[in-house]
Amino acid sequence: MVTILSTPLSPRLTFLCETKLSLSRSNRSVCCSLSEEPKDQCLSRRSLVYVLVASPCLLLPALSSSAKTKSKSPYDERRLLEQNKRIQRENNAPDEFPNFVREGFEVKVLASDNYIKADSGLIYRDFNVGQGDFPKDGQQVTFHYIGYNESGRRIDSTYIQGSPARIRMGTNALVPGFEMGIRDMKPGGRRRIIIPPELGPPVGPSTFFSSKQFEVFDVELLSIQNCERRTIIGFYSDVTCS
């Protein structure tokens, strides 16, 4: 079992404080130091991938996310974990879905050792590797996906919509975490991608997303097509993929 703590704040700042008390109540001192960690290099129906799309989870040791977060007792953490598991069962979350223990800005993600955390902060697990080459910039990828929120509730699915999504790589058509997640997939591959807030979509009144959360996607890469730009009558051009 591996854990990671994440926060939407970047770069992360960690305060280390030590309070010293002498035998005399009047003599008290507090020593603090500030350290900075380096920065880490569903969906509205079909529109997620295209809002996923058109607008711009764990593994490894735990990382501190907030200086003001009170330390939780093991009992509090177990209680929050059981609460998250209960909600995921009610939402019919898929097997081995990661658990999220959230308190304020601090999020602890719990998952099996089958998950891998990339240097970028993206977390993924391959269920089937597939065969062939990885997609390149300019190529079109065709894929199915199911999107979930932290509580395991399904927020979108191309399977339900009845047709897969098609996106050209390297055109900023996907949020960073989603494109990173499929960039090293092969046709026929199936992968679960856990996108941390810093690699996810923007939030706010003008977007589909109201708060910074981890997003989870089960992705099946169907095919990769080459694309070329053609010019018609000297001034109009478009891109065709086959």
From Swiss-Prot:
Residues 138-225 form the PPIase FKBP-type domain. One of its GO terms (cellular component) is thylakoid. PANTHER family: PEPTIDYL-PROLYL CIS-TRANS ISOMERASE FKBP20-2, CHLOROPLASTIC. It is found in: Plastid, Chloroplast thylakoid lumen. Interacts in vitro with LTO1. It catalyses: [protein]-peptidylproline (omega=180) = [protein]-peptidylproline (omega=0). The lineage of its organism: Eukaryota, Viridiplantae, Streptophyta, Embryophyta, Tracheophyta. GO terms for molecular function: oxidoreductase activity; peptidyl-prolyl cis-trans isomerase activity. Residues 1-31, 32-67 form a transit peptide. Disulfide bonds join C227-C241. It comes from Arabidopsis thaliana (Mouse-ear cress). This is Peptidyl-prolyl cis-trans isomerase FKBP20-2, chloroplastic. Its EC number is 5.2.1.8. It comes from the Eukaryota. Its main location: plastid.
